[in-house]
Amino acid sequence: MYRAVTRHIEVTVEPNFLPEKSSVADGRWFWSYTVVITNSGAETVQLRSRHWVITDGAGRQQEVRGEGVVGEQPVLAPGERFEYTSGVPLSTASGFMSGSYQMESASGEQFDIVVPAFSLDSPDGKRVLN
C-alpha cells in the first residue's frame, strides 16, 4: 500500500494487476487501483478535482484532469473516509502513477493534496535495478 498525508488528509492507494483484462499478445495491460481518502483534520472538506500523471514502462507520460472521482465530488467531515476503485490501461507491462486532488474546505479555501506515486507491476514486467 502507498500512503501520503497532506493537511491531515490521508490518501492510500492499493494497485492490483488484472490478468483477465490484459493481453500480452495485444500489448495491453490493465490494473485497478483502490483509493481511500481519510479526513483526520478538524474541518469538513470536499474533493473537487483530480490530476493524474500516468507513466508507462517506456517513459511516455499522459496527464489526466477532471472533476471529482468516479463521477463524485465527495464531502468528508472530520473522521470520515471515502473509498473508490478505478482502472488504468497501459501499453507496457509496467509503469507508475502519481497525482493530486484539489480539495475545498468548508470556509471556501482550495488546496491540493498529494496522491502518493504508486507502481503498476505485472508478472510480464522486467525489473531493472539501477
Curated annotation (Swiss-Prot):
SUPFAM superfamilies: ApaG-like (SSF110069). Gene3D superfamilies: ApaG domain (2.60.40.1470). Pfam families: DUF525. Coiled coil: none annotated. It comes from the Bacteria. GO terms for biological process: error-free translesion synthesis. Residues 3-127 form the ApaG domain. NCBIfam families: PRK05461.1 (NF003967). This is Protein ApaG. It comes from Bradyrhizobium sp. (strain ORS 278). The lineage of its organism: Bacteria, Pseudomonadati, Pseudomonadota, Alphaproteobacteria, Hyphomicrobiales. The gene is apaG.
